[in-house]
């Protein structure tokens, strides 16, 4: 049995609260159970230097954890001089996921930076970040359209993400920290609203997993993301 007593295919309670940051063009507070992430989308009227003259915009992301988001205080990475390898990996993943569903030429030569700040971590911070970041980005684009900065919505589709794993021999959906820390296999799936796969990250922590187990994890993930996309649709309605 899972520590949370959830069924194998059951997500934690998920909420998406919009317009939580007064000054950001778009914002969302996302919760996956006890994991809470503040996502803010900020418009910059200048794109990255390497895109100047291309007529194309850019969407990027930054990720950070507050010092007491974890059980014990974690030092701020700024004090070490640079982001950790884990932080860089996660923020690149968030950026790739958002760009996969964004029509970049529709932005013009502008950049949107989505900041994902983990307030409380209980597993799945990167998947919660991607899911909430999409809502913040959506609202940023709506803000831009309302002010005639852009004429069309650059978003091509929804995107959301969920973790899956093998816990005590059973494939399960949306691992919390208790499961994640003891899982035999841990995987993250980023999937669009139409079911396209953006990225899969999977690691066997103890024993290698089989093709059949991987396909079951994929099935669980697609079901979980379908539910997350429906929550996104309701949130922006």
From Swiss-Prot:
Which reactions are catalysed by this chain? tRNA(n+1) + phosphate = tRNA(n) + a ribonucleoside 5'-diphosphate
Query: Per the UniProt record, which EC number(s) apply here?
Result: 2.7.7.56
Disulfide bridges in this chain: none
Q: What class of enzyme is it?
A: transferase
- Keywords of the record: Nucleotidyltransferase, RNA-binding, rRNA processing, Transferase, tRNA processing, tRNA-binding
Give the protein's function: Phosphorolytic 3'-5' exoribonuclease that plays an important role in tRNA 3'-end maturation. Removes nucleotide residues following the 3'-CCA terminus of tRNAs; can also add nucleotides to the ends of RNA molecules by using nucleoside diphosphates as substrates, but this may not be physiologically important. Probably plays a role in initiation of 16S rRNA degradation (leading to ribosome degradation) during starvation.
Concerning HAMAP family, the annotation shows: RNase_PH (MF_00564)
**Designated name of the protein:** Ribonuclease PH
Give the organism, scientific name: Methylorubrum extorquens (strain PA1)
High-level lineage: Bacteria, Pseudomonadati, Pseudomonadota, Alphaproteobacteria, Hyphomicrobiales
Tell me the gene name: rph
């Amino acid at each position: 049995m899972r520590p949370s007593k959830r069924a194998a295919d059951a997500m934690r309670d998920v909420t998406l609260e919009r317009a939580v940051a007064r000054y950001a063009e778009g914002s969302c507070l996302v919760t996956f159970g006890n994991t809470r992430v503040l996502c803010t989308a900020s418009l910059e009227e200048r794109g990255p230097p390497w895109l100047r003259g291309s007529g194309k915009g850019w969407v990027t992301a930054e990720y950070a954890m507050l010092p007491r988001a974890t059980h014990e205080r974690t030092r701020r990475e700024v004090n070490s001089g640079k982001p950790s390898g884990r932080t860089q990996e996660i923020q690149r993943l968030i950026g790739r996921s958002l760009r996969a569903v964004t029509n970049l030429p529709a932005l013009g030569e502008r950049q949107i930076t989505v900041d994902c700040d983990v307030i409380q971590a209980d597993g799945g911070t990167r998947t919660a970040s991607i899911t909430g970041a999409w809502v913040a980005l959506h609202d940023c684009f709506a803000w831009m359209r309302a002010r005639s900065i852009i004429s069309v919505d650059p978003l091509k589709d929804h995107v959301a993400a969920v973790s899956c794993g093998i816990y005590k021999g059973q494939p399960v959906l949306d691992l919390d920290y208790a499961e994640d820390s003891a899982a035999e296999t841990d995987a993250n799936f980023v999937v669009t609203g139409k079911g396209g796969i953006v990225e899969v990250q999977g690691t066997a922590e103890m024993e290698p997993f089989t093709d059949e187990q991987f396909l079951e994890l994929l099935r669980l993930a697609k079901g979980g993301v379908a539910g997350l996309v429906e929550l996104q649709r309701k949130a922006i309605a």
